[in-house]
């Protein structure tokens, strides 16, 4: 089993078996980040209430296709992001929260522009590798209806990426390997459904 498969299995197992006990009203939320969808990356998050002010969760995003096949423009990746939230007001899934994240991603990008000048060389080359990061966010949740919420969140992550670099976006020989420490802004507009 590859590393990413092991990590994903562990996270899903923790979420499933961690909730085997008594499930209370409004103890599970499912969410989707609309900004992540805008990058053509389907994503899904699940949060479980573990205390009156704490939730544990995970987000998975997966982009397995090319942006433009003729140019071989791609931003393929798998992202797994376990998180913990501390709700600051009237209980979970209400008003403001602080969130801590662990982030893992396997990526294969080429002939594209990555925001914030993280990898300027990607326009002329292809990078394939992995990254780990730690992040922190502040967010706010608005109640739309009994089961529906909208969240807005912003934060920052610091991480480390290691990758193989290839000659051109579509093909080419391996040029070498590299690594990089990075700082990345985190933004989200989440549509949330609370399961009773």
Name each region found by the language model:
Residues 51-53, 89-93, 143-147, 184, ...:
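Outer-membrane beta-barrel channels and translocator barrels
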Residues 30-32, 46, 58-60, 82, ...:
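Membrane-embedded beta-strand positions of outer-membrane beta-barrel proteins
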Residues 26, 38-40, 74-80, 94, ...:
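Residues that define the transmembrane beta-barrel architecture of outer-membrane proteins
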Residues 30-45, 63, 69-75, 92:
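Solvent-exposed loop/turn segments connecting transmembrane beta-strands
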Residues 34-38, 60-66, 86, 102-108, ...:
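Transmembrane beta-strands of outer-membrane beta-barrel pores
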Residues 84, 181-196:
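Outer-membrane beta-barrel "beta-signal"
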Residues 64-77, 106-130, 162-180:
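Flexible, solvent-exposed loop segments that connect beta-strands
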Residues 19-25:
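Sec/Tat signal peptide C-region and signal peptidase I cleavage site
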């Amino acid at each position: 089993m590859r590393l990413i498969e092991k990590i994903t299995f562990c996270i899903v197992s923790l979420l499933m078996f961690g909730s085997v006990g008594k499930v209370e009203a409004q103890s599970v939320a499912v969410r989707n980040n609309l900004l992540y969808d805008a990058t053509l990356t389907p994503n899904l998050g699940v949060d479980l209430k573990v205390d009156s002010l704490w939730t544990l969760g995970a987000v998975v995003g997966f982009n397995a296709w090319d942006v433009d096949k003729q140019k071989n423009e791609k931003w393929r990746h798998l992202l797994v992001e376990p998180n913990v939230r501390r709700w600051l007001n009237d209980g979970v899934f209400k008003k403001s929260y602080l969130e801590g994240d662990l982030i893992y991603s396997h990526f294969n990008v080429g002939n594209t522009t990555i925001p914030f000048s993280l990898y300027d060389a990607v326009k002329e080359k292809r990078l394939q590798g992995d990254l780990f990061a730690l992040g922190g966010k502040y967010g706010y949740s608005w109640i739309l209806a009994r089961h529906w919420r909208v969240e807005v969140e912003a934060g920052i992550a610091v991480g480390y990426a290691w990758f193989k670099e290839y000659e051109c976006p579509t093909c080419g020989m391996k040029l070498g390997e590299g690594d990089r420490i990075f700082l990345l802004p985190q933004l989200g507009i989440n549509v949330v459904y609370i399961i009773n």
